[in-house]
């Protein structure tokens, strides 16, 4: 009986020790991301993938833009950002709003990111909007961004920015960030036509409304 109690005691001690060690490692990792003196050039895409949430990614981008020499760089308050995580002024003197999405590669960014960052432009008096992600974008997200001239920076672009910064090539990093967005433009005939785009109707809703009205 005493032997069994001793074994149980040892198991409990080992379990608690492992839990405390795991917690300490997590706390250390979080502190690393928010300490003002951590080496920004040491951060790689792998470090971004290990971040526990989006706030670490936002802080990284905030510091990166400052290091790249941009002016008017601000990190917004998380709870009331109206769709923008970081704001900065580019080399042309144009204010940009950024929405940062730290997603794992198996989860692409959807259209809500474009909707949110585009809708907050007027609030921040910005002329350009950017969505930056550690993942990729859905096809519908790319389409909506192209129509509204929202710049999309995906994982591949982000890696190029990080590598350029780590190599000390600030101009290349800024050129990637400030490159014109992929635009989806209408032809001249479409732009001057009175024909509206086809709307995908909800026929169930239409049928229901007709039924209600007919009563």
Where are these regions (language model features)?
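Mixed-charge (Asp/Glu-Lys/Arg
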Residues: 1-82, 87-215
């Amino acid at each position: 009986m005493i032997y069994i109690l001793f074994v149980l005691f040892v198991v409990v001690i080992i379990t608690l020790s492992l839990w405390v060690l795991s917690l300490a490692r997590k706390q250390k990792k979080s502190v690393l991301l928010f300490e003002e003196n951590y080496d920004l050039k040491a951060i790689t895409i792998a470090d971004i993938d290990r971040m526990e949430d989006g706030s670490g990614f936002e802080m990284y981008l905030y510091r990166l833009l400052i290091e790249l020499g941009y002016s008017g760089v601000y990190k917004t308050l998380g709870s009331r950002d109206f769709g923008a995580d970081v704001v900065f002024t580019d080399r042309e003197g144009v204010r940009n709003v950024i929405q940062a999405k730290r997603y794992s590669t198996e989860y692409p960014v959807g259209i809500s990111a474009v909707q949110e960052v585009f809708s907050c432009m007027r609030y921040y008096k910005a002329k350009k909007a950017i969505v930056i992600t550690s993942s990729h974008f859905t096809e519908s997200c790319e389409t909506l961004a192209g129509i509204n001239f929202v710049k999309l920076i995906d994982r591949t672009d982000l890696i190029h920015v990080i590598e350029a910064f780590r190599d000390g090539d600030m101009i290349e990093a800024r050129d990637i960030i400030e490159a014109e967005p992929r635009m989806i433009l209408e032809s001249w005939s479409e732009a001057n036509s009175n024909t509206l785009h086809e709307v995908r109707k909800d026929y169930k809703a239409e049928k229901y409304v007709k039924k209600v009205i007919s009563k």
